[in-house]
Amino acid sequence: MTAAESIAASINQIDEKKQKLKKAFDDLQAHRSLLSPSFNLSWSEIDSHFSSLQSSLFNRLQSAVTSSNSGNIETPTAVTTETPVLWPELRKFCEKNDGKGLGNYMIENSRKRLSINEELPNAIRCSENPAPLVLDAIEGSYHCSSPSSSSSARAIDVKRIFVLLLEALIEINANLTNDLRERARTIAYDWKPNIGNKPSEALGFLHLVAAFELGSLFSTEEICDYIFLISKYKQATTICKKIGLDRNRIGVLVQKFLDTGRLLVAIRFIYENEMVGEFEPVSILKTSLKNSREAAKRVCAEGNYSLKVQNEATDKELSALRAVIKVVKEKNIESEFMEEKLEECVKELEDQKAQRKRATKFNSPANPQQPQEQKVDNKRPRVANGSSMEYNLTIPPLRPQQQPPLLPTPSQILQVNPYGLLSSILPGVAVPYGNPRALFGSVPAPASRPVFYVQQTGYGMPPPQYRPPYYPQ
């Protein structure tokens, strides 16, 4: 086995290893109550990360093999060496024009569809009639994707496989005949009633319409409604172009995205359809930042600033910030966001989240609870100073509650006795002379600024209510 084949075999095992990791993750989720509140990693994020790595490794392997072949073109071995094929069965089905077998095989391996998708376009090119092959695959497996099928998860997997097949057909730009369009029209009419508000159904339907050029059979309003439904998918803009929506219709769609708060989706449509002149993407991005900041504050307020709610709000705000940063870097408009200091905002939010995590560990039940008398002497943990940036979650600082005075007012404490001396109504409290005239004069001593020792601690001692129990009182 050559090095390239060994690497290809290892890449092919990634999906199997991901399934084992998924099982371990599910076991961990069963004990979620024992985890830190800040642990909010989802399996979709993990799966997306490893799928991205798998795709990147596969592309780099293909590039390395291709460059090796071009560099050694004179050697016989280099001429015969081909890019390693991870799914040779795909080509076998395509060479035999076995569409039904191809569809069933892809559905059985639907969990590995990302790896399959890398080879599918080249495999379909091996077929003499790619368009009938794809239609046969869809017709042969369409019953598995109906809403009445036994497993809804399987139905979703089948629709995803249909999307992969139709995307590959769009990529190779296969020849279409009227008979093929008629077959595709029949499938489309059967598919349409099942769409409802399900984006996965709308995505497959629109790919069928785009691949077999059926846009004229449906109203533009219907097509726009379905595109609005699938706007979260990256293929939405490609489908718009393939179906042939005019610029005015796309502009109406963008305005609808803006009116419904899907600002980042609107940004994607604006740039990919070159509509920067009609809209102001920089202003839209800044509005998105403002909305995410206000939403985070609102979530915190509604959740009474609990630790869990604060972490959730921070995660959502971080996600929005990173999405904006990605667009800003891709479109080279960093100069428009110098004042916002987006990277610093991300770091500050991450620091706030880490600080809350440390505070949670410090106050966790694992720490022995301190006596109540000693708690009052502890200082509150220092809170990071808020900066001038507006992206921090505005959590009001803890204000000490106003305690009632521990002693009565001076006028209630002090009384003037018949001899003109100040006396205290508190038992055991001796009061010194309030005024030199009190001893010899006939005028009662003024009590405007009395001196009473109960309010003095002397020699830097803390007030009585703050003294730990080992100080004599």
Swiss-Prot record:
Free-text tissue specificity from the UniProt record: Expressed at low levels throughout the plant, with slightly higher expression in developing seeds and the highest expression in pollen.
Domain of life: Eukaryota
InterPro entries: Frigida (IPR012474)
GO terms (BP aspect): cell differentiation; flower development; vegetative to reproductive phase transition of meristem
Biased composition (Polar residues): 361-373
Region ranges (Disordered): 356-384
Keyword Coiled coil: yes
Function: Inactive FRIGIDA-like 2 protein.
UniProt keyword list: Coiled coil, Developmental protein, Differentiation, Flowering
Protein name stated in the entry: Inactive FRIGIDA-like protein 2
Disrupted-gene phenotype: No effect on flowering time, due to a partial redundancy with FRL1. Frl1 and frl2 double mutants flower earlier than frl1 single mutant.
This protein's record includes keyword Transport: no
Pfam families xref list: Frigida
Disulfide cross-links: none
Miscellaneous note of the record: In cv. Columbia and cv. Landsberg erecta, either FRL1 or FRL2, but not both, is functional and required for FRI-mediated up-regulation of FLC.
Coiled-coil parts of chain: 3-35, 306-361
Family (UniProt): Belongs to the Frigida family.
